[in-house]
């Protein structure tokens, strides 16, 4: 009798997506042909030795040592002039590498003719040398879904079949030579749950930009193709500057001034490994004094590709504590490792929920409200997150919603109220970022709007497009179209339009959108718990 009563009281299970969007990335194919990689310096030397033998002679070796070292050229400028012939519909003076990218981009000739400048903008982005093999600080890969969000799924050496030609492949010979230089004990990276082409892209050091604010690029807009048959549309300047990078010792000295003194093993107990990456490990642990469960990232500093970002991320997290942000708790230097202690949210990332379950408008409104509260706090403290997406939203089992991953965040100052670096994740990028214009905090609002579409449709717009064409569509299409707009309420559609307004001045701010009528539909955060449980169960079943 009691069993039948219990069954009657249980709420119906939340709806699951018929086709999980959390699919293996190998299912996607953008027909992106990889570009050949420029030969590395050591390979050039090997070829020279084969042409000029005698390197094995001791006398020659001695002479080689005596030769003065000639440094690489600096402050040189390589200018590319690309034009567009409106009659033939072809670009003129386009580099071969760009031509190859364009051929595999699926951007039609009509689209190229319609907006050649947008095509060149996205080509410039892909050609940016600093996008190759860059990796965010504190990013790991793991097959453990509970670690998702703490173990970011955008590690640059995690390759999948559908990866776009951001990082050209290396030959087997070059690959072997690189592997010899790396630690043989490094575990192989696990394939990330999201397609590799949704990974975050980093093209300029945030620390460098903060330390010495530079004025936005005021390069004049080239004449349009309509005004001349063959106009110079684009100038690409490639400079190699002497950068004032911090030395490893300077970084360690700065970290020592930030971290706590003492042995973390005396403060935390019951360490349980939840993730492993090439540069470190993530554990859960208990604070002995409070009993609080925490996440601890243990990173080998020697294996961190951008050590300068460590200081940036820790300082931003430490100085910006908020109920809607995954809060930094503490950090320690233990030998060659940096241990960063953060809040632990056992619910996993929002990505698991959006890809495995169907959210209703009340639940979506609740998530949007919590995210806007986090963004309002950050923006009021002159911080732009720059990588808002479901992967960077963590959930507690009680339904709490918190923003994480400050590897790309930027501090803005009165002297530098706009930024012009290309960072973020392509499918969530605001148009002004794609077209490399100066931008402000409202780039986070656009990304939030794209994330709201994720919650409706299970994935961001253009995810199945070639990444280069997706960037073109973001730059030219304006507000992306919904698959089934008629299924959404008028108030929700208006909220999306306010977030995804092309005109930045008309786009809502976090403070303004917190007053939007759509947020009045928000259900209690506890309504997210059944979705979290259903997503965990679906993922567990799919892995069997």
Swiss-Prot record:
The entry's keywords: Allosteric enzyme, ATP-binding, Cytoplasm, Developmental protein, Kinase, Magnesium, Metal-binding, Nucleotide-binding, Phosphoprotein, Serine/threonine-protein kinase, SH3-binding, Transferase, Ubl conjugation
Domain CRIB: 70-83
Compositionally skewed regions (Basic and acidic residues) per UniProt: 63-73
Keyword Cell inner membrane attached: no
Cofactor requirements of the protein: Mg(2+)
Biased composition (Acidic residues): 171-186
Tissues expressed in: Detected at high levels in the brain and at low levels in the testis.
Protein name: Serine/threonine-protein kinase PAK 3
Organism phylogeny: Eukaryota, Metazoa, Chordata, Craniata, Vertebrata
């Amino acid at each position: 009798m009691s069993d039948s009563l219990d069954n009657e009281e249980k709420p119906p299970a939340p709806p699951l997506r018929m086709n999980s969007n959390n699919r293996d990335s190998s299912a996607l194919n953008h027909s992106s042909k990889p570009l050949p990689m420029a030969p590395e310096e050591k390979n050039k030397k090997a070829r020279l030795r084969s042409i000029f033998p005698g390197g094995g002679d001791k006398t020659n070796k001695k002479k080689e040592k005596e030769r003065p070292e000639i440094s690489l050229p600096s402050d040189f400028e390589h200018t590319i002039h690309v034009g567009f012939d409106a009659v033939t519909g072809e670009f003129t003076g386009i580099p071969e590498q760009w031509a190859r990218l364009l051929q595999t981009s699926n951007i039609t000739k009509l689209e190229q003719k319609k907006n050649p400048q947008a095509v060149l903008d996205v080509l410039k982005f892909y050609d940016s040398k600093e996008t190759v093999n860059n990796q965010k600080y504190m990013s790991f890969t793991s097959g453990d879904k509970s670690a998702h969000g703490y173990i970011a799924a955008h590690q640059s050496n995690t390759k999948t079949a559908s990866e776009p030609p951001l990082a050209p492949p290396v030959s087997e010979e070059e690959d072997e030579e690189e592997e010899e230089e790396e630690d043989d004990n490094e575990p192989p990276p696990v394939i990330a749950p999201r397609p590799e082409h949704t990974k975050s892209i980093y093209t300029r050091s945030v620390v460098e930009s903060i330390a010495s604010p530079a004025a936005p690029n005021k390069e004049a807009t080239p004449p349009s193709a309509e005004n001349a048959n063959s106009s110079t549309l684009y100038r690409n300047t490639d400079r190699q500057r002497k950068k004032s990078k911090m030395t490893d010792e300077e970084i360690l000295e700065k970290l020592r001034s930030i971290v706590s003194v003492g042995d973390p093993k005396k403060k935390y107990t019951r360490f349980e490994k939840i993730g492993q990456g090439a540069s470190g490990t993530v554990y859960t642990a208990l604070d002995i004094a409070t009993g609080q469960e925490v996440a601890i990232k243990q990173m080998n500093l020697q294996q961190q590709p951008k050590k300068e970002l460590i200081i940036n991320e820790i300082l931003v997290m430490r100085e910006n504590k908020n109920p809607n942000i995954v809060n930094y708790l503490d950090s320690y230097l233990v030998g060659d490792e940096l241990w960063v202690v953060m809040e632990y949210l056992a619910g996993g990332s929002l990505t698991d929920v959006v890809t495995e379950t169907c959210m209703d408008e009340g639940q979506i409104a609740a998530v949007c409200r919590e995210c806007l509260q986090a963004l309002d706090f950050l923006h009021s403290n002159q911080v732009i997150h720059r990588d808002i997406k479901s992967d960077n939203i963590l959930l507690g089992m009680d339904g709490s919603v918190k923003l994480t991953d400050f590897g790309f965040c930027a501090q803005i100052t009165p002297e530098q109220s706009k930024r012009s670096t290309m960072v973020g994740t392509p499918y969530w990028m605001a148009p002004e970022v794609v077209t490399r214009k100066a931008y402000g905090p409202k780039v986070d609002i656009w990304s939030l709007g794209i994330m709201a579409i994720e919650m409706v449709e299970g994935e961001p717009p253009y995810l199945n497009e070639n990444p280069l064409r997706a960037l073109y569509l973001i730059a030219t299409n304006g507000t992306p179209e919904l698959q089934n707009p008629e299924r959404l309420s008028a108030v929700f559609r208006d909220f999306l339009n306010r977030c995804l307004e092309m005109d930045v001045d008309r786009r809502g701010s976090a403070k303004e959108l917190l007053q939007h009528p759509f947020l009045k539909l928000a259900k209690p955060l506890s309504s997210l718990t059944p979705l979290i449980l259903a997503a965990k169960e679906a993922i567990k079943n799919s892995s069997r």
